[in-house]
């Protein structure tokens, strides 16, 4: 993430130097407006919940924390972002949420989290846009939970952004066949099914009900209970 942001800043500075002197001020104002229209990456506590928001800086995305476990996201022509509310650390808990999720293109609504030792990024996908996120991984099996069958996948990310900086790590995916926005996710059912397939989690880091967008537009309004 840091490297990409530095490259973007370098590219902007190079472009500014390439224009006539009388256009520099105008370009500077335009770049300032561009940087201000998207929410910067951040984490923390908000109204009794942990929140995490990360963006690669591409496109226009606005993340807003609301009361208690509520948040909204609006995005347009983004690169990649993921954000939401939940807990730090996470656990094998029942998670109830409600709201709306309307992606145009590639987006996911999921229980999303990380563990360490091993470093694992995991998704329990409740709904998605026009791309099934598991299709790029290795199919492992299924688990039935909360009124639907979920397909289980693994994938490996190499030299990618993680909670420990740039790293190589494994992703675990449960992707719901019958999409929904709202209900209770029994995370222990997924964690146990993964373990039976040799997909072991480590020590829980954060765990949120997340909206993610990738090269897409859309909006989301979610409340975690």
Swiss-Prot record:
It is found in: Secreted. Optimum pH is 5.0. Retains about 76 percent of its activity after being incubated at pH 2.0 for 30 minutes at 37 degrees Celsius. Keywords: Carbohydrate metabolism, Glycosidase, Hydrolase, Polysaccharide degradation, Secreted, Signal, Xylan degradation. Residues 1-18 form the signal peptide. Metal ions, copper, iron and N-bromosuccinimide decrease enzyme activity. Manganese, calcium, L-tryptophan, beta-mercaptoethanol, L-cysteine and dithiodipyridine stimulate the enzyme activity. Its EC number is 3.2.1.8. GO terms for biological process: xylan catabolic process. One of its GO terms (molecular function) is endo-1,4-beta-xylanase activity. It comes from the Eukaryota. The keyword Secreted applies. GO terms for cellular component: extracellular region. Its main location: secreted. The active site is at 121 (nucleophile), 212 (proton donor). Optimum temperature is 50 degrees Celsius. Displays about 95 percent of peak activity in the temperature range from 37 to 41 degrees Celsius. Belongs to the glycosyl hydrolase 11 (cellulase G) family. This is Endo-1,4-beta-xylanase B.
